């Protein structure tokens, strides 16, 4: 198992605070099964996998922000569709 140095990952992201944010968001995606790892898992924990992805340049702040925005839009659309269905059903009952 190759070791991940935080310094290499910090160089890819910009500063250690952003690294913590990006790595934790990515690790959560991997841990919950929402996204597949982009590197070999090698029996590593999600946080180590996330750091390895960042170090390899496969995950950046921009990629995570775009992913989060797309996920939020998808969730908003689903919620609006559900509200429209409820409102549509109530209007039919009143008629």
Curated annotation (Swiss-Prot):
The record ties this protein, via SMART domains, to: RNA_pol_Rpb6 (SM01409)
- Record's catalysed reaction(s): RNA(n) + a ribonucleoside 5'-triphosphate = RNA(n+1) + diphosphate
Q: Which UniProt keywords apply?
A: DNA-directed RNA polymerase, Nucleotidyltransferase, Transcription, Transferase
Gene Ontology cellular component list: DNA-directed RNA polymerase complex
* Protein's GO biological process: DNA-templated transcription
Q: Show the SUPFAM superfamilies listed in the entry.
A: RPB6/omega subunit-like
* Pfam families the UniProt entry points to: RNA_pol_Rpb6
Q: What does this protein do?
A: Promotes RNA polymerase assembly. Latches the N- and C-terminal regions of the beta' subunit thereby facilitating its interaction with the beta and alpha subunits.
Kindly state the subunit structure of this protein: The RNAP catalytic core consists of 2 alpha, 1 beta, 1 beta' and 1 omega subunit. When a sigma factor is associated with the core the holoenzyme is formed, which can initiate transcription.
In which family does this protein belong, per the annotation? Belongs to the RNA polymerase subunit omega family.
**HAMAP family, sorted:** RNApol_bact_RpoZ
Q: What is the protein name for this chain?
A: DNA-directed RNA polymerase subunit omega
**Classification lineage:** Bacteria, Pseudomonadati, Pseudomonadota, Gammaproteobacteria, Alteromonadales
């Amino acid at each position: 198992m190759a070791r991940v140095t935080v310094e290499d990952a910090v160089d890819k992201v910009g500063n250690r605070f952003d690294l913590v944010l990006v790595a934790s968001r990515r690790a959560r995606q991997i841990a919950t099964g929402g996204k597949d790892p982009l590197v070999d898992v090698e029996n590593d924990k999600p946080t180590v996998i996330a750091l390895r992805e960042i170090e390899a340049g496969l995950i950046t702040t921009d990629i995570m922000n775009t992913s989060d925005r797309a996920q939020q839009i998808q969730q908003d659309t689903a919620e609006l569709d559900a509200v429209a269905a409820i409102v549509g059903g109530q209007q039919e009952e009143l008629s």
